[in-house]
């Protein structure tokens, strides 16, 4: 049965999850195998070696592609990797020495690290700009620009980038526009429908949703780009195991339900923080006062589960606060059902200290989970009082 054209929630449950034809099992099995029997030399049933392909991985790739707008049987598709950084690295490997890349100044620290500390050494030319300013983005694009890398909302400052405008600027220079859609997920934002050429995810985060699996993915409708990335996936071999794929596929089934709860709770938390005298600044696109609010309202279905803020007492107050929460767990990562709190400057973004992508030392980042919002607000209230 084709689920093309059905709503997001239906496709999240059913695409890539057909009942097993051999047994009738409603949930597709985990194909925990490294190799596949061949009928004769050069003749097999679609799989030969698990680095090249595995049915469980295919199921997940098909599902994620559908959710991002590339239906089964259409040009392009989805590819899964052992981590979000493996997916990012694969995209950068499509570039050649001398090519130029434009990267957001507010970006995941690992993305900056691999671009600036690894690929620049191999001949990549890199410009880091504030992409919330379209003028600055356009000024950074050169004749040799081949990739414009967008994060929106950005990590960790929750800036909002105009995807359609960024894609148009990239295409005018003959460049590819890639969007890291990890924070928003395809439930809230569909970059391909706004003109982007490629979407990247850390599926560790909201797609998996339970903090129990590490993975990455990319989706593109462009056949040539898909085939190049597929070659690199197989050649470099940074692929997820079947158990990781199965766990992620299980998580995706409840993505819509979880994202609604994340968004609702994040709005409650952000509004609470905005009214507290101990808080100097709150960044959340859902607040009408946020500089990215109007744009986010146009290109997102809701505003996501991430909140950032700066305590009025500076970095020492921030350190005391993150150590004082009881419901929020002090930990890196994001997107799980449980609420997390961290200091990006010393944790997830420590690698960008002293660079153009450095984040404020007193910034606190929240991954707001699906607990009861009253408990989350109460926890932050007591932590602010103790800090």
For the regions a language model picked out, list residue spans one by one.
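Conserved PLP-enzyme active-site core in the AAT-like
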Residues: 2, 14, 67, 73-278
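Conserved small-domain helix->loop->beta segment predominantly found in fold-type I
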Residues: 267-326, 330-335, 349-358
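N-terminal "arm"/small-domain region of PLP-dependent enzymes with the aminotransferase-like
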Residues: 1-54, 60-63
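A common structural junction motif
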Residues: 236-237, 324-333, 383-387
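Short, well-ordered beta-strand elements within core beta-sheets of diverse protein domains
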Residues: 248-257, 304-312, 364-369
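PLP-dependent enzyme catalytic core of the Aspartate aminotransferase-like
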Residues: 72, 116, 125, 139, ...
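Glycine-rich beta-alpha junction loops
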Residues: 17-19, 32-37, 183, 205, ...
């Amino acid at each position: 049965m084709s689920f093309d054209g059905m709503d997001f929630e239906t496709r999240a449950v059913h695409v890539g999850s057909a009942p097993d034809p051999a047994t009738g099992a409603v949930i597709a099995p985990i194909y925990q195998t490294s190799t596949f029997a061949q009928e004769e030399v050069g003749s097999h049933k679609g799989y030969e070696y698990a680095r090249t392909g595995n049915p469980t991985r295919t199921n997940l790739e098909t599902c994620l592609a559908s959710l991002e707008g590339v239906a089964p049987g259409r040009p392009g598709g989805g590819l899964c990797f052992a981590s979000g950084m493996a997916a990012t690295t694969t995209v950068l490997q499509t570039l050649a020495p001398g090519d130029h890349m434009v990267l957001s100044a507010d970006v995941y620290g690992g993305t900056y690290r691999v671009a600036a500390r690894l690929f620049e050494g191999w001949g990549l030319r890199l410009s880091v700009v504030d992409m919330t300013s379209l003028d600055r983005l356009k000024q950074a694009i050169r004749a040799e620009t081949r990739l414009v890398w967008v994060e929106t909302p950005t990590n960790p400052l929750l800036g909002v980038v105009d995807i359609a405008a960024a894609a148009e600027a990239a295409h005018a220079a003959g460049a590819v526009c890639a969007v890291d859609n990890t924070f928003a997920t395809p439930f809230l934002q569909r970059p391909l429908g706004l003109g982007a050429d490629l979407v990247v995810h850390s599926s560790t985060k909201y797609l998996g949703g339970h903090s129990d699996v590490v993975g990455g993915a990319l989706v593109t409708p462009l056949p040539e780009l898909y085939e190049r990335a597929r070659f690199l996936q197989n050649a470099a071999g940074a692929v997820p195991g079947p158990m990781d794929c199965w766990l992620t596929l299980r998580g995706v089934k409840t993505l819509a339900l979880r994202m609604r709860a994340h968004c609702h709770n994040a709005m409650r938390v952000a509004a609470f923080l905005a009214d507290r005298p101990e808080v100097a600044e709150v960044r959340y696109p859902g607040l009408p006062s946020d500089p990215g609010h109007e744009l986010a309202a146009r290109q997102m279905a809701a505003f996501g589960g991430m909140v950032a803020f700066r305590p009025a007492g500076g970095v020492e107050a921030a350190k005391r606060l993150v150590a004082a929460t009881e419901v929020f767990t002090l930990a890196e990562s994001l997107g799980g059902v449980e609420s997390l709190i961290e200091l990006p400057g010393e944790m997830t973004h420590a690698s960008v200290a002293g660079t153009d992508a450095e984040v404020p030392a007193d910034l606190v980042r929240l991954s707001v989970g699906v607990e009861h919002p009253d408990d989350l607000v109460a926890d932050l209230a007591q932590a602010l009082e103790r800090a």
